[in-house]
C-alpha cells in the first residue's frame, strides 16, 4: 500500500477513499482492483475506519497550562532578595579554601599524617610554630660576590662542584668535562636560482 505525507498526516491511498469523501465509487467488477466490491450493509472492507487519527502523543490539557500561568504571574520574584539570601561567590571561596587546606595539610605541613590542618596547625598565619621535623629545609641566599666568583672559575672545573645542600651532594658528577665555547652564527642570504 503506498502512502504519502501531507501536512504532517499520513494518508493511505486505497479504493475506499473516494467512498469516504462522498464521491461516486467505481462500479463493482469494473475497477482496477481484484478485491470484491464492498457490501451495502457495511460488513465488507468499506466499513473499516482509517487509522490516521491514532498517535502516540498525549494531548495537553489547556486548562492545566492556564492555571500554571496564573500561579507564575501571581508570584513576585525579588532577585536582589534572592542574591542576599545566597551569595555564590562566598561558596566558591569556601570550596577553594577547603581544597587548599587539604592540600596544605597533606603535602606541605603534616606530610602524610592523617590529621586535618585545623587540628595540626592552630593558626594558618603562624608557620614558625611548626615542629622542625615537619618543616622543609630553609634555603640560604648566596651573596652576589660569591656567585660572581663561582662563575669566573667555572671554565676550569672538570665536573660540577659539590653543592652546599645535602640533597645535591649525592648526585653523580658528569663524566664529561664542561666546555663553555663561544658559538657564532652567521645569516646566509638566499641565492635566487630562478
From Swiss-Prot:
State the span of motif (D-box).
48-50
Q: Which Gene Ontology BP terms does the record give? A: maintenance of meiotic sister chromatid cohesion; regulation of mitotic cell cycle
What InterPro entries is this protein classified in?
A: Patronus
Induction line? Constitutive expression with no clear cell-cycle regulation.
DEN-box (motif): residue ranges: 14-16
Q: So which domain of life are we looking at?
A: Eukaryota
Outline what the protein does. Not required for protection of centromeric cohesion.
**Mind telling me which PANTHER family this protein's record contains?**
NEURON NAVIGATOR 1-LIKE-RELATED, PROTEIN PATRONUS 2
What is noted besides the main data?
Answer: Patronus is Latin for protector.
Protein known as: Protein PATRONUS 2
Q: Which organism is it from?
A: Arabidopsis thaliana
What is the name of the gene encoding this protein?
PANS2
Amino acid at each position: 500500500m503506498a502512502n504519502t505525507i501531507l501536512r504532517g498526516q499520513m494518508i493511505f491511498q486505497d479504493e475506499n477513499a473516494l467512498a469516504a469523501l462522498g464521491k461516486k465509487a467505481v462500479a463493482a467488477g469494473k475497477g482496477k482492483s481484484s478485491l470484491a466490491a464492498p457490501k451495502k450493509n457495511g460488513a465488507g472492507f468499506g466499513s473499516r475506519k482509517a487509522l490516521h487519527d491514532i498517535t502516540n502523543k498525549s494531548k495537553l490539557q489547556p486548562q492545566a497550562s492556564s492555571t500554571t500561568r496564573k500561579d507564575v504571574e501571581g508570584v513576585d520574584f525579588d532577585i536582589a532578595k534572592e542574591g542576599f539570601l545566597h551569595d555564590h561567590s562566598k561558596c566558591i571561596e569556601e570550596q577553594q579554601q577547603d581544597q587548599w587546606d587539604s592540600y596544605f595539610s597533606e603535602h606541605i605541613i603534616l606530610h602524610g599524617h592523617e590529621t586535618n590542618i585545623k587540628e595540626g596547625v592552630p593558626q594558618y598565619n603562624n608557620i614558625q610554630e611548626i615542629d622542625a621535623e615537619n618543616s622543609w629545609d630553609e634555603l640560604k641566599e648566596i651573596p652576589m660576590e660569591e656567585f660572581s666568583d663561582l662563575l669566573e672559575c667555572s671554565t676550569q672545573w672538570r665536573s660540577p662542584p659539590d653543592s652546599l645542600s645535602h640533597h645535591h651532594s649525592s648526585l653523580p658528577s658528569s663524566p664529561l668535562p664542561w666546555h663553555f665555547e663561544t658559538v657564532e652564527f652567521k645569516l646566509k642570504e638566499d641565492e635566487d636560482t630562478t
